[in-house]
Amino acid sequence: EPSYYSTPDYPDWRAGFENKIYEEKKALLDQYGIAVWRDHDHTHAHNPDGIFTGVIKYLGWEQYRVNADTEGMTMYFEFPDMTVEKMNALLKEKMCLNGIRYIGNPKDKLKKVAMVGHLLPNIFEHQPTTGDGFCKEYATEVIRIMEEEDVDAIIPGETIDWTVMSYIRDAVQLGKVKAAFNVGHFNLEELGMKYAADWIPEVIGNAVPVHYVPSGDIYKFE
């Protein structure tokens, strides 16, 4: 993901004010001769997506995936024996999390779970407000699959509280089996970077050693 704190990921700091953290980080890279080659989004562009191929592999979920040929950001999984609390424990273990924010009743049984894209405004799909006052957005599509495709739970990347998360909270309070596991963007996709250390040697051979070094959970919990 971006190295220097901006979405366009400029190779330098361009905000017009001094950033001491940027300066110190860059100085360390220069001091130790470290080159940063940001290949994350290129790996997303693989077919199939190289990041989520790795996530699914290292979660051990290949056997549970359904509708694998479905286009778009959503990946579906069906589990024979899964609950909200079991999913919490599994994600914490496999993703090496310090904790997890979730919505749902711990004992509720989950059958169909969807790994979805980032739930942010104006991402993936956006249209201006129509004449009837409706503005289409990706979060609305996620609500649709939970309503129409019997999706019990989602695992998103980035989230905001006022769209899908509020829908799921309301659903749970109304007695429905719905859940969300907010593991965080970096935590969700880091296993995909681990997978990169598997396929890069297949491309370049053994000429250059390849190692996966996890950055760890960005968050702490009390």
Where do the language-model regions lie?
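Active-site catalytic microenvironments in core metabolic enzymes, especially phosphate/sugar-handling
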Residues: E1-E222
